[in-house]
């Protein structure tokens, strides 16, 4: 059984965890020009994400619920990224479940609080559990997508 974990957003990551292999990668993105002023926006490259996920042949995917803050300039990109991920999963015919970050963070990272502390704890745990991916994890800055997959494949017993 192959489980995919997705840390939603253009700065996120995704991982596929199978019994005998693991894959971790930053979210594929592209820059687009939007509107009359041609403002540059970073978007998930949905066709590439679809190809990557399809190639992993996952049994199920778990993706983190997008940021639901009060600032429009953060909510809209998060929703746009979330929609792209959903489309990629649906086109690949991968069943998915949207989960709250606390579902996996609390059991794996404990009582760590604060965004920067959580990123650091995620990176350290990811490097400890998957030393063969330490370079990629460190370069990305956290292992959230990998830890989501790890939690649902190995801890929660899915």
Regions found by a protein language model. Name each.
Residues 1-158:
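Phosphate- and other anionic-substrate recognition elements at nucleic-acid/protein interfaces
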